[in-house]
Amino acid sequence: MRYLVSGKEMKLLDQNTSQVFHVPELVLMEQASMAFVQKLLLLKQNKLSTALIACGSGNNGGDGLAIARLLREQGVFVSVWQAGEEEGHRTSSSYDVQKQICSAYSIPVVQKEKVSAGEASYDVVIDALFGTGLSREISGELANDIDVLNQLSGWKVAVDIASGICSDDGAVLGTAFRADDTITFSFGKKGQYLWPGNEYCGKVHVVSMGITQESWLDDKPHTAVLESEDLKKLPSRMAHTNKGSYGKLLIIAGSVNMSGAACFCAKAAYRMGSGLVRVFTCEQNRLILQTKVPEAVLVTGQENEEETLLAEQLQWADAVVFGPGIGTGQRA
């Protein structure tokens, strides 16, 4: 089971780690950046020569600056585009520290004109413009900056989340970076798994930045994604049971020329473990249902007797599914 968090929950975890457990914000930033670089190089099997890192003016941009320095240590020729500063946005204190370090190491800085002109090509384009705290629409020059990044060739990777994607619901806030991969910290974010955010974030890789379970304090994550490993936790069926031990499901589905919905619904019912399945449908669907789902019991009748038949079936059933392919006519 993979737990997912919202932007607000992630901010709270950061704060708890810094304020309750006294881990400085800059230490968390360094650990996040190191984990990002390790994963990035692993994904490309250390075959990266050039990288462009586009940095916003907040902590996500600070991550980007640290990533640039760490990639340079690994022999990658890096260029930093300080997009947030270019557009006149106020910088965070951690960003300022990382900028000073990059300046001391003489890490190359490129301007928007050079990036948009396509004067250089990059093996990887790294998006560190906006993080999970974004809640406003991106507009103006910063929206144009994202469009410039999207037009570049090369492998595109987002830091924590694709810029412009709401971490809570996956909405596009004006415009968004289109990543091939996203390397996110500590937990997956809800918006990375919901449409359309999942299309912009690409494949999501979760790495540790040093935030532990203790940072939840008295709270806990509320959202999770089930994985194939979780299926092993489901109880096996006992040897002395039969199909009647696993519930009786009545499916009221299908109409003339709409037999497919009833078929798919019956198959899904068996797939999820229903014991006895009856399909209440019109007589015209008999042949295809008995051919496609022979294990289901078929119940049909003439119009003048359907009401009585349906009442009997409702008494029999433990649960009822109503509606797939039922149509909008008088019979429905």
Regions found by a protein language model. Name each.
Residues D123-V124, L129-P221:
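Internal gly/pro-rich beta-alpha loop/helix module
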Residues A117-E119, T175-A176, E312-Q313:
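Structural alpha-helical scaffold elements that stabilize or flank donor/cofactor-binding regions
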Residues V110-V115, L142-D147, D168-A171, Y193, ...:
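A generic local structural motif
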Residues T91-S94, Y122, D169-A171, L289-K292:
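Short secondary-structure transition/capping segments
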Residues V37-L129, E137-V159:
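Nucleotide and nucleotide-moiety/phosphate-recognizing core
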